[in-house]
Amino acid sequence: AETLLSLLDQPLLKLADVSNLTFRGLILEATRANAIEIRGGASNRIAGCLIRNIGNTGVVIEGGTGHAVVSSDVSDTGDGGVSLTGGDRQTLSPGGHFVENCHFQRLGRWSKCYVPAVAMTGVGLRASHNLIQDHPHCAILYWGNDHLMEFNEIHHIALETGDVGAIYTGRDYTFRGDKIRHNFIHH
C-alpha cells in the first residue's frame, strides 16, 4: 500500500504566455491545488498523462488559443477534470481549445456540484471522444457560443446530486451555435 500526503498548495505545472510545448507521458499527482494551469500562449498540449489525487481541478486552461488535453486519464480530483476558457464572446472569435480521447472518473470528491469532467466557457471549444464516468454532478458543463460536444461516452453521473443533465448549461439565450451530437449517455 502507498500513502500520499501533499503539503503543496500550488500547481505542479504552471505555464504563462508559453507556446508550442507538449508534456507527454507524465504522472501528475499529490497537490492540494490544480495539477496544471495554462494561461495565455498558444498550442500547448497535455498528452498521454495520468493526472490523479489532485485537490482542485486536473487542468485549468484560461485564454490563449489552441491548447489541448489529449489521450490523458484524470481521476480522483477534489473538484473537476479540465476547465477550458477561451475565445471572445463579443467578436465570436474561437478559442480553439479542446479535450479529446480522455478518460475521467471519480471527480468531485470535495465539491459535488458544478465541477464537471469538462467545463467550457467562451467561444469555439470542443470536447470529443471522451469517456466520463462515476461523477457526482454533470459530465460536461458549457457556457458560450459555438462549442462542440461529440462522440463522448457518459455514464454513472449525477450520483450525489439532482436537477442536472449529463451535458448541462442554463438560462442564457445568447448561447448560440453550440452543437451536441453523437454522444452515448447511459447508466
Please state what every model-predicted region is:
Residues T85-R89:
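Asp-box/WD-like beta-propeller blade repeats and closely related beta-sheet repeat scaffolds
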Residues L15, I38, I61, T91, ...:
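Residue-level marker of regulatory loop/turn positions in helix-turn-helix DNA-binding domains and
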Residues P11, R32-E37, G55-E62, G78-L84, ...:
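Short glycine/acidic-rich loop motifs that flank beta-strands on beta-rich extracellular proteins
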Residues L7-A16, S19-A30, A33, S43-N56, T65-D79, S93-G108, P116-M120, R171-T174, ...:
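Right-handed parallel beta-helix
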Residues A1-G40:
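Extended, small-residue-rich solenoid/repeat segments and analogous flexible loops
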